């Protein structure tokens, strides 16, 4: 039934890293973890659903913020141990900091520099609860 899930090399915790990329620009938006259930649900619902290690439960991206990731394509790398999700990022914000991407810092001159702006105040996104 779900033999395709057996092709994935899950880590010792039953997880696989998943990289979300903008399906139009190719920009890396974020990295999160998926388990068998979240990956199967992602395929079935055509939206990104991750496994929250800190909360120990499924995390439907956008369930609190409204910043849903609509799935356009899934890819598995050559070693079968990393997933790429090509997504449409609703609201153009993937990061809980209110930025387009979680990768908003660049290493320059021996330090990490913030180079991407906050598009929306996280307190406004999460009703001051994040």
From Swiss-Prot:
Q: How is the cofactor bound?
A: Binds 1 Mg(2+) ion per subunit. Binds 1 zinc ion per subunit.
Q: InterPro entries from the xrefs? A: PRA-CH, PRib_AMP_CycHydrolase_dom, PRib_AMP_CycHydrolase_sf
Q: Which residues does the record give as Zn(2+) binding sites?
A: 78, 95, 102
- GO-annotated cellular components: cytoplasm
What does the record give as its pathway? Amino-acid biosynthesis; L-histidine biosynthesis; L-histidine from 5-phospho-alpha-D-ribose 1-diphosphate: step 3/9
**Entry's localization field:** Cytoplasm
One BP term from GO? L-histidine biosynthetic process
Q: What class of enzyme is it?
A: hydrolase
Under catalytic activity, the entry for this protein gives: 1-(5-phospho-beta-D-ribosyl)-5'-AMP + H2O = 1-(5-phospho-beta-D-ribosyl)-5-[(5-phospho-beta-D-ribosylamino)methylideneamino]imidazole-4-carboxamide
Q: Where is the signal peptide?
A: none
Swiss-Prot/TrEMBL keywords: Amino-acid biosynthesis, Cytoplasm, Histidine biosynthesis, Hydrolase, Magnesium, Metal-binding, Zinc
Task: Write out the GO MF terms.
Answer: magnesium ion binding; phosphoribosyl-AMP cyclohydrolase activity; zinc ion binding
The question of whether Amino-acid biosynthesis is a record keyword is answered with yes
Function, as annotated:
Catalyzes the hydrolysis of the adenine ring of phosphoribosyl-AMP.
Subunit structure and binding partners = Homodimer.
HAMAP family from the UniProt entry: HisI
Q: Which family does it belong to?
A: Belongs to the PRA-CH family.
The name under which this protein is listed is Phosphoribosyl-AMP cyclohydrolase
């Amino acid at each position: 039934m779900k033999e395709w899930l057996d092709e994935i090399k899950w880590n010792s915790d039953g997880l696989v890293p998943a990289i979300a990329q903008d399906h139009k620009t190719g920009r890396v938006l974020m990295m999160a973890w998926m388990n068998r259930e979240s990956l199967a649900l992602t395929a079935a619902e055509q939206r990104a659903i991750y496994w929250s290690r800190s909360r120990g439960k499924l995390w439907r991206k956008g369930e609190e913020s409204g910043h849903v990731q609509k799935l356009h394509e899934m890819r598995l790398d050559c070693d079968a141990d990393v997933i790429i999700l090509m997504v449409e990022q609703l609201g153009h914000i993937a990061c809980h900091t209110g930025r387009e991407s979680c990768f908003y810092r660049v290493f320059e001159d021996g330090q990490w520099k913030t180079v991407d702006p906050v598009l929306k105040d996280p307190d406004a996104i999460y009703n001051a609860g994040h």
